UniProtKB/Swiss-Prot annotation:
Name of protein: Osteocalcin
Chain ranges of the Gla domain: 53-99
Lineage: Eukaryota, Metazoa, Chordata, Craniata, Vertebrata
Positions annotated to bind Ca(2+) 3: 76, 82
UniProt keyword Signal present: yes
Highest taxon listed in the record's lineage: Eukaryota
Length: 101
């Protein structure tokens, strides 16, 4: 009984989907499906990667974003400065260990 219902539903699906194909013409000019695609030039412009893409920065090395970032890295490499920075802040810890910022 279940097999008959499944076959009936599959047959109806084939009739519904098959009937739509016969209503449309086969020529490309009359087909509305060509509207779903864009030209190769437009797709190339759309898919073009930015010059500052992630892989480019990884291969080249990312630029330092903050002027204090290099000093922060120096302080992090010194365990005493790093510990003091956790308590009183990076700038004050760097000033105490290495002089004025």
């Amino acid at each position: 009984m279940k097999l008959a219902i499944v076959l009936l539903l599959l047959g109806l699906a084939v009739l519904c989907l098959g009937g739509k194909d016969s209503q449309h013409s086969a020529s490309a000019g009359d087909s509305r499906s060509s509207e779903a695609f864009i030209s190769r030039q437009d797709s190339a412009n759309f898919a073009r990667r930015h010059k500052r893409s992630y892989r480019y920065n990884v291969a080249r090395g990312a630029a330092v974003t903050s002027p204090l970032e290099s000093q922060r890295e120096v302080c992090e490499l010194n365990p005493d400065c790093d510990e003091l920075a956790d308590h009183i802040g990076f700038q004050e810890a760097y000033r105490r260990f290495y002089g004025p910022v």
